Structure formats: C-alpha cells, structure tokens
Amino acid sequence: MTTQDFLLEIGCEELPPRRLNQLSQALSQTIKSELEKADLSFENIHRYATPRRLAVLVNNLALQQPQRKIERQGPSVKAAFDKDQTPTLACFGFAQSCGVSTAQLKVKKTKKGEFIYCEIEQPGQNTLDLLPNIIQSALKQLPTPKAMRWGDHKEFFVRPVHWIILMLGKDLVPATLLGKMASCETRGHRFHHPKNILVTKPDDYQKLLLTHGMVIADFEKRREKIRDLIQKAASEKGEAIIDEGLLEEVTGMVEWPVILVGNFKAEFLKLPPEVLITTMKVHQRTFPIKNKNGDLLPYFIIVSNIESKNPKRVIVGNERVINARLADASFFYDNDLRTSLENRLPKLGDVIFQRQLGTLADKARRIEKLAAFIAKQINIDEQLAARAGLLSKCDLVSEMVYEFPTLQGIMGYYYAFHDKEPPLVAEAIKEHYLPRFSGDQLPRNLLSPCVAVADRIDTIIGIIGINKSPTGDKDPFALRRAALGILRILIEKELSLDLFALLNEAKNNYAVELPNVNVVNQSFDFIIERLRAWYLEKEVPASVFMAVLASHPDDPLDFDRRIKAVQHFQTLPEADALAAANKRVSNILKKQAAELKSKTIDHSLFDSDAEHLLADQLKERAELVNNLYKKADYTKALSELASLKEPIDIFFDKVMVMVDDKEKRENRLALLSSLQQLFSQIADISLLS
C-alpha cells in the first residue's frame, strides 16, 4: 500500500504554558482516533508543542482507504419473486441499482423475514480528500473550555491562529482551517527567526525548525534539555531544586531555552525557605539553588526564551524583581511575628467559612473539639490535639498567607514555633493539610492526623448537612478529595476509628441545626463510596468490596483488613467451592427466612454422619475463628474457615435440607444459618461466586 508522511501545524499566539502539553497530547490522540475511524492505516504519530505552535506528524499514512465490502438490502423475497420464483420488476430494479444481475443476488433471513441483498465492492476514498474533515473533527474534540474568537472570524480556538500547515508527502492539502488557508510554510522563533520557513516534506519539519528557526519543537526533548542545562548551571554553586510542575510550565513558555544564574541579597536567607522558594517560583518562574546540606543559597536559575546580546541585563532585571518581592515578604513576615497565632483567633470571626455554617472562628472551635475526640480514641494527648485544632486556621489571616495562599499551614508552623507552642502542635498546624492531592505524602506524627481528619470530617458533615453534596463533576468544596484524605490517613497510618461515631460527634459540634436530617448516614455513605473508588483504582475486584461492605464495618482500617483477608482467601484452592456453597446457603436461607424461628441446633435431630460432621467442625472452628475475629486477624480466620470445605461438600452431597419433617428441616436450616454467620462476620463470601 502506498503511504506518505502527513504534517499538521497550527501556528498561533502564545498558548497557556500550563496546559500546553495536555493540549498537544489531546490533539495527537484525537487525530489518531479520527484516522482509525476513517480506516486509514499509519505507522506512528509524533507530536510537537511550543508556545506558538501545536503540530502532529503522522508517519506512513495510507493514501487511500482499503476497499470495503458492503451489503445492500433490497425488497423482501415475497416482493422480489412471484409464485413461479421468477424475478419481479422490483427485483430487476434493485439488481440494476446495484450494477449486478438478478442471478448474483442472495437471500438473507432477518427478524423481519427473508430479504434479497447484494454485496458491493466499495473503493476506498483518497486520503487527500478525507483529511480536511478528519482534522476539523479532531479540532472540535480538543479540551478548550476557554476558547476565543479573533478579528472577524467565526472560528474558535485556544488562541488566535496565524498560520496552518497541512501537508501529505510533498503535496499541500487544500483546505481552510480555523479561518486560515493551509500552506507549506512555518515560522521560527518570534525574535531570532520571525521569517517564514518553507517545509518541503513533513519529515524535515523538526530539523528545519531547529537549524533554521531556533525552535526545539519536541516538548519532551525541550523539557529534558532545560533540566540538563539547569543542573549544569547550578552545579557551579550547588544543586538546583527542580519542581516538576514549574519545569513543565517553563517548558511551555520557551522555544529556545537559555539558562542564566542570578542572585539575591543574602540577608533574605533569614526567611523560611518555603517563602524564598515560593517567591522565586510563583513570581519569576525561577529555580532555587541549595547546598549539599539542603540549605538554600542566595542564587537562582533563570530560563530565558532569547539569546540576549546583553545577558547581564536580563539577570539584573530578574534580580531587581526578586529582591523587591523578598523585601515585601520580609516586611510581611516581621509584621506577622508581632501577633501570636492565638491573638489572631478573633480575626477569624471576620472570615466566612460558609454562609450557613458560620465563620472560620466557628470552624476552628469545632476542629478543636473533634481533634480532642479523635485523640482520645487513638490514645494521643487530647490537650495538644485540641490546641493544634484551635490554632490550625489562624495563619489564614496573616499577611504572608494573604500574599502567598499556598503557604497556609507552613507559615502557621513557623509562627507557632515563634510563639513557643509545643513542637507537635506546630507540626500539626503544618501537616493537617496533608494529603493535598492524590499520592501526596501523609502527616508524619500521630497528632497531625487528629487535626487533619477533624478538619475534613467537619467540612463533609457541614456541606452535606446543608444539602450541597457534590454532583457530577462539580465539587466546589473538594469533598471527594477530603474523603479520600481521611481514608488514606486512617488506613495507611493504621488508625482505628469508628467513622459513624466520628460523624455523629462532628454533627453535634455544630451550633446551628443542619437542615439535612440524614446528614450522618449520607456522609458515611459518601465516604464509603470514595473508599470503593479508591479500591477500584487499586484494581480490587468490585465483588471483594461488596463482600466486605455486606458485613457493615464502620472502621476504615478494619474495612481494609477485611479487604486484604478476602483477597488472600481468593488465592486458596477451596475459595471457589466455598463461595458457591455460601451462595447456595444464602439462597436457601432467604427463601426459608420465616422458618428460622430458633437458631439453636439440636444434635438429637441429626440422622446422618454428614450433619454431625458439619456441626462438630463448626463448633470446633467457631471458637478459634471468633478469637481471631476479636484480634482482627481476618486473613487467618478465613484460612481456618477454608477447612470447612470438605464437611460442607459432604453435607450437601448426603443431606436433603428441605425435608417434610418440620423439626429436622428447621434444625438443618439452623445449622446452615450458623455456618453463614461464621463467615459473614468477616465478609459475605457468597458474593464472590
């Protein structure tokens, strides 16, 4: 099959740097999807992205769709042939429209009866003709929630478009996209090579931009080059602190990276390192440098988009801005230190947490109570937990956090140390925001989780209590993230807490009456649903989750232990047979629920060895399993129960449960009920079948 390379480039004004890589991936994926939908084969796809362009190179794209066999259905057999099986006018007309003789027509049975049909070889369309619509369709699927219009164009895109390349091999694909006629010309660096560059064939695109246009088109290559240049430049002073998010953003801001090293006044090193790093990162997109001990040095790395003839001027400009920013930060910090965290509590009363739920001062007092309640459950100092909870939000009204919101908690940590609060309290103020996102680190000490869980539980109860639960993609109060944070803390830090009791306590701490009377149950269900989603991400089968859920554990850590026990149980050779047997038992007991008046087993009513064997084995295992259950050793408990496979199999082989004799029937049902209870106190194993 004949193939050619295909190139698409969309040249535009500067694209959002934080979303550039995502846009590039999406464009590549949508084009791939549309080509596959059109049945056009290709070898692979390369994507390119710089601040001024999105491009896709498709290698060895087929120049034509393959021939396809299509079936055309005609009239029914009754209409196509008369009583003598002679073709009718309808049959001749259909055959003529298909370009075949009546002898070439076939009969096919359908739900609506027998119909005649013909198979037609449909030639594939030329790729050159298909490409404009394919690209149009791909562009419509791009995630561009803030697309814009420009000039008098009706088209929308992320940024105004200035040029378009559409090439198949050496040929131009004639089309108009996003208001621009396609051409074979790209443009180089905005300052170093603003002139047009003729692309003679798609495969030369990346090389031409590099050698003629001073543009590194490949996003990944550009990012790694920047990383290498930063590390090399920093090595003369120390070691660069490379934030991956900032590196991604800077890669989206430059086409031709040039690395420069600047410095700031050493006197600013007295500021907390997080303040210095945030100032350099947020305001100037620069990378800090540290020494071998991890201490910050008064230097930073600048990633410039131009090879300046006077690099010193670029450095001085950045130094002037950073020194000014750090001078402001130093002023805010010194001002903040004049007021203790405790004395900031009244100011929290001026900040609304949520209109129906009161102020941040109200929330801080609720966290204080709930943190102490949690501390008592896990044998942590209640007074320290209460103190940390009370002060946890005080830094939100400091000048530093007002200027740098991402430093919430961190500044509270430094201010608490300055106020001579206990070190654990200071750490809890900083760590109670952890985890901030999926996969983030957890609080390190055991006091911090008390405040972290209390804060999140209070928010969940309050927001669900005023009937503002998340719906669809909308979660303005980040309740899903809060729920996942609670679960990760309790499970990964191995903290045993009754979630239902905790939610009740949180509800009672609210001074206002929450409109949602079912708030505790709904909050519990909401958190458990996040637990289900979490296990789904970990590829825990839904049947395992449902089996554990059926036993109604209120403690997330206990829930997790049961999950692991059931997963281990599934690896045992007896697992499938026992799951099937439990399902059989469950079905029998559901149908005969009315007859289970007494759950006492009467051995005198047994008339077979199989009944005695199962009853004896149950009694023997029950004591052992119940002791293991009390220790929460569910894995060993289920392993012990696996030994019941043989007596259960013998029982069902030899014994008829639903006999006419009522006493014997009810006694056998009681025996099966005891068997079910022994398993179900850990999980409903029948749901694994």
Curated annotation (Swiss-Prot):
One of its GO terms (cellular component) is cytosol. It comes from the Bacteria. It catalyses: tRNA(Gly) + glycine + ATP = glycyl-tRNA(Gly) + AMP + diphosphate. It is an enzyme of class 6 (ligase). The keyword Protein biosynthesis applies. One of its GO terms (molecular function) is ATP binding. Keywords: Aminoacyl-tRNA synthetase, ATP-binding, Cytoplasm, Ligase, Nucleotide-binding, Protein biosynthesis. Signal peptide: none annotated. It holds the Pfam family DALR_1. It is found in: Cytoplasm. Transmembrane segments: none annotated. Its EC number is 6.1.1.14. HAMAP family: Gly_tRNA_synth_beta (MF_00255). Tetramer of two alpha and two beta subunits. Belongs to the class-II aminoacyl-tRNA synthetase family. This is Glycine--tRNA ligase beta subunit. It comes from Coxiella burnetii (strain RSA 493 / Nine Mile phase I).
